[in-house]
A protein has these predicted regions:
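Acidic/histidine-rich alpha-helical segments that form the ligand environment
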Residues: 84-117, 134-136
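Short, contiguous alpha-helical
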Residues: 2-4, 8-22, 26-29, 34-80, ...
Length: 154
């Protein structure tokens, strides 16, 4: 199996498969309401909503940069608590997450193993494409763990 195929499997498993952590995102978020997602369970911490929004923002950000877009991340790092916390807005965010997963799947389907060790241009050569893609997986896992903990406190 090629390295890109392994990466595709890691993305798919983390989202809705059988990840080694035994925690997949779709299961974590399934029964969380918009009210629960927006709740600041720990006042100094991010809400579940903010964490999902942050993950989606970074997934989109890195993918766009891998595809050649040039832009800057927002100063809030995609962590602003939303004004609209309606069920429709929550569903919209979850749909955006699902679309992000599909966008990564499409990107990875077209990626060749030979390109994995090319420099990730926005990092000015400090990181490879391989490292940045794995970084997104680690980033998601880290924040999904936070979501699991916050969900237990609901």
């Amino acid at each position: 199996m090629s390295e890109v195929k392994h990466i595709q499997k890691l993305f798919a498993d983390l989202y809705d498969g059988v990840p080694w952590t035994e925690v997949k995102l779709t299961t974590i978020l399934t029964d969380i309401t918009s009210e629960q997602a927006a709740k600041k369970i720990i006042p100094e911490a991010n809400s579940i909503w903010q964490l999902v929004q942050h993950c989606v923002g970074w997934r989109d950000n890195v993918l766009r940069k891998l595809q050649g877009d040039v832009f800057h991340s927002p100063k809030d790092n995609y962590l602003t608590q939303p004004d609209n916390v309606s069920p429709q807005a929550w569903q919209h965010l979850l749909s955006h997450l699902e679309q992000s997963e599909k966008n990564w799947e499409r990107f990875l389907e077209q990626l060749d193993d030979n390109k994995l060790h090319a420099p990730y241009l926005p990092s000015k050569g400090k990181f490879t494409i391989y490292e940045v893609i794995h970084g997104i997986l680690h980033h998601d896992n880290y924040h999904f763990g936070q979501i699991v903990m916050l969900k237990k406190l609901l």
